[in-house]
């Protein structure tokens, strides 16, 4: 069985030098109180399944958080640009997250400020759509 999609995206970020590792500075489906700097991946409701295939349309929000707004924004932009660069070199808009996992990726918008929390940490993020296997 394949890894969960979010774990494969963490592996992609680590391979690109954009994160240290799962549970270290990169988290899946939650944002812990510590550390202050994090990358968090959240999956939410996707679109209907792709007819006549075993593919599904999944929705992911990629967020970054730091006490320094410029650092949070810069990291979100680095991740966005890494995905964008991979898409520009692919004829079919496919990103290979791992050797086993690929996805046709749609960057839904560029990074934007989401919030400032009670600890004065700023969160930036952006949303992507991924057509891939269910797992």
Task: Identify the role of each PLM range.
Residues 1-52, 86-100:
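Small/polar-rich, solvent-exposed N-terminal microdomains that initiate assembly or binding
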Residues 54-72, 79, 121-132:
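Oligomerization/assembly interface segments of phage tail-like spikes and tubes
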Residues 85-131:
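Acidic-leaning, charged glycine-interspersed low-complexity segments
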Residues 48, 133-135:
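Short, acidic Gly/Pro/Ser/Thr-rich loop/turn segments
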Residues 43-48, 66, 111-113:
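Short, well-ordered turn and helix-capping elements at secondary-structure junctions
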Residues 37-38, 59, 104, 125:
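A residue-level signal for beta-strand positions that form part of recognition/binding surfaces
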């Amino acid at each position: 069985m394949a890894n969960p999609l979010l774990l494969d995206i963490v592996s992609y970020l680590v391979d690109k030098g954009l994160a240290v590792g799962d549970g270290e500075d990169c988290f899946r489906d939650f944002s812990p109180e510590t550390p202050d700097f994090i990358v968090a991946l959240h999956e939410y409701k996707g679109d209907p399944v792709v007819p006549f295939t075993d593919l599904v349309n999944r929705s992911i929000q990629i967020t970054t958080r730091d006490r320094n707004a410029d650092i949070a924004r810069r990291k979100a932009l680095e991740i966005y640009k890494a995905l964008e660069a991979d898409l520009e070199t692919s004829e079919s808009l496919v990103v290979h997250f791992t050797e086993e996992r690929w996805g046709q990726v749609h960057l839904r918008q560029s990074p934007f400020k989401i919030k400032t929390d009670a600890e004065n940490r700023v969160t930036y993020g952006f949303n992507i759509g991924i057509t891939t296997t269910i797992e």
